[in-house]
């Protein structure tokens, strides 16, 4: 996510997230200690720019002298946090699920395989199994957000919606950010967990802080509950 189009865009993205007054952020395609990013622990650095936020990073695979993975960062401190390796299967790369349990909700993120729908389905099954077993009876709403690399109407999207309700708008594209034509990023809630009132949802294309197309190749998706 960071440094894809412009060098050292951490502050730009932090300013954008502060602009929308975010409380929790799911982040995909993070580097940790890689050569290409000059050995920065990207999520830790970003969380510090947000004001010493709590965070959890999960490494999906070794990459370029360091690691590559996903993460969640939150304004409040988590009561529990962990990551779970997801099956690569016939997909292109290993993937990971990252979870942060807060006092009153649970939020997790993943980035499904970008090549194989078969691999995506295996990854979805383990994500759902993990979150149901750990939090299905927790009395807390459970949210999953990230790059699913699949539209809601795809086979992967349909499998997700058996157990997850999509809460964000899906009628507009999220990728690519400069000409969004596919909705492959969304935020969902695990069915059977306490219902939340959705105040609003947006796919964010314009910020006062800067050009979102220079910050990421995906548009950020916001959910207000």
Residue ranges and their predicted role:
Residues 1-4, 31-32, 82-88, 111-120:
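Surface-exposed cleft-lining segments at the edges of enzyme active sites
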Residues 1-48, 62-63:
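N-terminal, active-site-proximal structural segment of metallo-dependent hydrolase catalytic domains
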Residues 4-13, 57-58, 172-177, 206:
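N-terminal post-signal-peptidase region of extra-cytosolic proteins
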Residues 26, 143-144:
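Residue-level marker for buried hydrophobic side chains located in beta-strands
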Residues 48-50, 64-81, 180-196, 225:
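Conserved beta strand-loop-helix elements of the APE1-like EEP
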Residues 52-65, 82-87:
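A short, structured active-site edge motif that brings together acidic residues
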Residues 68, 74-80, 92-109, 225:
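Beta-strand-turn-beta hairpins that frame and shape the catalytic cleft
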Residues 85, 118, 122, 129-143, ...:
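Metal-dependent phosphoester-hydrolase catalytic domains
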């Amino acid at each position: 996510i960071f440094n894809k189009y412009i060098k050292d865009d951490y502050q730009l993205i932090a300013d954008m997230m502060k602009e929308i007054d975010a409380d929790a952020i799911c982040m995909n395609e993070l580097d940790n200690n890689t050569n290409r990013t000059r050995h920065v622990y990207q999520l830790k650095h970003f969380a510090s720019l947000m004001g010493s936020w709590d965070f959890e990073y999960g490494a999906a695979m070794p990459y370029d002298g360091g690691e590559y993975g996903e993460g969640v960062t939150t304004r409040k401190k988590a009561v529990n946090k962990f990551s779970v390796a997801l099956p690569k299967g016939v997909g292109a790369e290993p993937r990971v699920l990252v979870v942060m349990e807060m006092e009153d909700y649970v939020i997790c993120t993943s980035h499904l395989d970008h090549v194989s729908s078969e691999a995506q389905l295996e990854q979805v099954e383990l994500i759902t199994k993990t979150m149901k077993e750990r939090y299905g009876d927790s009395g807390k709403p459970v949210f999953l957000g990230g790059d699913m690399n699949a539209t809601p109407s795809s086979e992967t999207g349909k499998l997700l919606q058996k157990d997850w309700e999509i809460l964000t708008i899906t009628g507009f594209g999220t990728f690519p950010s400069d000409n969004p034509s596919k909705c492959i990023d969304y935020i969902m809630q695990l069915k059977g967990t306490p219902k939340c009132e959705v105040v609003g949802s947006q796919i964010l294309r314009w910020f006062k802080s800067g050009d979102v197309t220079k910050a990421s190749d995906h548009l950020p998706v916001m959910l207000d509950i």
